[in-house]
Structure formats: C-alpha cells, structure tokens
Amino acid sequence: MIKIDAQSVDFYYGDFHALKNISMQIEANTSVAFIGPSGCGKSTFLRLFNRMNDLIPDTRLEGKIFIDGRNIYSKGEKVDTLRKNVGMVFQKPNPFPKTIFENVAYGLRVNGIKDNEYIEETVVKSLKQ
C-alpha cells in the first residue's frame, strides 16, 4: 500500500529551483533514507510532507504530493490536521519563523485553545521552567 506519493515535484525558493521533477512512492510501514551532501534538498523535500515550507515567504511548489491518497496541497486541506499526523524531528532545533512566544503558543493554538489569557499564562510558565 502506498503511503506517500510525490508526483513531478518541483520546488522554488524565489527564483532558485531547489527541487527538480521528483517523483517517488513510499510504501506504508517502510523505512526510507534520503542521503546526499549538505544543501542538496533533502530537508526541503521532507518539509513538503507536512507543509512546513508554507511558512517560508516566496516559495512555490509545482506537482502533487499525496498522503493516504489525499492531495495534501489541495484547496481546503487542513494544514493543522496534516501536521498533527505528519511530524518532523530534526537533527538541529528548527523553530517556526516566529517569535519565541508564538513558537511555544503554537501547540496550544493548533489544538483549539483560543483563550489568550490562558495561552499567555501557559507560555510564560513554560518558559520559566
């Protein structure tokens, strides 16, 4: 069973063409290694699977990526739900390009907490620990 299906993926940082025509299928319950020199696009490609590159200004994806048969870049796809199901663990810390406060508050907000006073208290308490 195919878990991830990347079809004719091209990715750009501004005018820089970082990924060129990548197509691959990854079976469910398998291990895959992406090996290559620094700067060749491994992390860029992996970040496409939970749309972390959406947070970087002036980027563009061409092609399609399906996870469990769903096009994760289709209109109406809920990014928060996707990120709950597709996690990333990086060798080096990789905070979202936001303030420290917003990075810590992100987990609360993505889980539906809207009470700003509660969010502020929780973030401050967490940062003091």
Where in the sequence are the language-model features?
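The feature captures the beta-strand-to-loop junction immediately N-terminal to the Walker
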Residues: 35-37
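Short coil-to-beta microelement around the adenine-binding A-loop and adjacent beta1/P-loop entry
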Residues: 16-17, 80
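Conserved ABC ATPase "signature" region
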Residues: 64-71, 109-112, 116-129
